[in-house]
Regions:
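Helix N-cap/capping motif at the beta->alpha junctions
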Residues: 35-41, 65
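Acidic di-acidic motifs
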Residues: 7-9, 86
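Conserved sequence signature across two-component system core domains
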Residues: 6-7, 36, 54
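CheY-like receiver
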Residues: 44, 51-126
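Two-component/phosphorelay signaling modules centered on CheY-like receiver
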Residues: 10-34
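Non-catalytic signal-transmission and effector/linker regions of two-component phosphorelay proteins
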Residues: 1-4, 14
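Switch/coupling loops of ABC transporter nucleotide-binding domains
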Residues: 1, 31, 79
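Short, surface-exposed amphipathic charged segments that create phosphate/polyanion-binding patches used
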Residues: 4, 48-50
Length: 128
């Protein structure tokens, strides 16, 4: 799995990174993790490298996570997008970018691990 995480709050970014590393160790999963504190840097990287999963904060200064997701969909329709946010107010809008999940902060192992496991298993299945 090639995962991009974007959150303008460093503490939140590090907390999600810690959860992802914990899941990776528990599952012995092959994961490449990329962390971004703004959507501009994320989008620049996403145009150069394909990520299989985007974990995006919704409310960020400058380009929001929702706007970043719309931009990602212009060049990558296959990647999974999951929003990690403190605001339930954008859940409906997330359908417009075919978001897989909309998780409310604080993000916990109980919320994140089943999702990661499901995606990892799907990725490991041979394509028919």
């Amino acid at each position: 799995m090639n995962i991009a995480v974007c959150d303008d709050q460093l503490e939140e970014l590090k907390a999600v990174e810690s959860l992802l590393r914990m899941w990776q160790e528990q599952q012995h999963a092959a994961v490449r993790l990329h962390l971004f504190q703004n959507a501009g840097a994320l989008l620049e990287a996403a145009r150069k490298e394909r990520f299989t999963l985007y974990l995006l904060d919704v409310m960020m200064p400058g380009t929001s996570g929702m706007a970043a997701a719309r931009e990602i969909r212009t060049f990558d329709s296959a990647a999974d997008i999951v929003f990690l946010t403190s605001s339930p107010g954008f859940a409906y809008e997330s359908y417009g970018v075919q978001a897989l999940e909309y998780l409310l902060k604080p993000i916990t192992a109980k919320k994140l691990f089943p999702l990661l496991s499901r995606l990892y298993l799907r990725e490991q299945k041979p394509q028919e």
